[in-house]
Amino acid sequence: ADGTQFLGTEAFDFEESGIDILGASAYKWLLAGYGNGFYLVKDGVMDQFDLKGIGNGSVNNDASKRNSITFCKFLEPGHLDSLNFGSLEFAINFLDEIGLENVQAQLEKLSKRALTAFSELDLLEPAITKRKQHSTIFNIKGNEKLFNKLTKENIVASPRGGGIRLSFHFYNTEEEIDVIATLLKRWSSK
């Protein structure tokens, strides 16, 4: 399973989950920067793999150890990026300090506020407006002209599939969503 779109949004216990292998890029909700990711593999599925490839670092520069290394050593690249490991550790500690229950609560507030605001402005697909719960990623109706206006106002957005993606994380505020909604309303009335 891909945890990129989930990890960092609420508490998650890999061992208690029904997932055997989880991979994730850590740049998104985990806030650990680009080029950072990991895999989690449950002990019970490791014997289903016959991994052959190793890097020099996997065997600590001694190829004679190739048959005695642990499962995870087969998954290591040739050169490990200790700076990225430190960034990931810092990000995980930062989120732990805030508390993932607080992150989740803030995301729920932001999602409700954005869902209401964008629905009232008729900027969402009908299927989205009917949802009781939605993520904090919204694809609003809009063209390149609207995208450029948002960008000019220092609002981070991305053109996506004929619309404009707006995403919010715990560090965003409901007031920021209100500002965006006010601008969108003003621009639509012109």
Regions found by a protein language model. Give the residues of each.
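Short, charged, surface-exposed secondary-structure boundary motifs
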Residues: 9-10, 31-36, 168-171
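Acidic donor-binding loop at a coil-to-helix junction in glycosyltransferase catalytic cores
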Residues: 44-82
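Conserved PLP-binding catalytic core of the aspartate aminotransferase-like
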Residues: 108-153, 168
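Conserved PLP-dependent catalytic core of the aminotransferase class-I/II
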Residues: 68-71, 83-126
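Catalytic PLP-binding core of fold-type I/II PLP enzymes
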Residues: 1-21
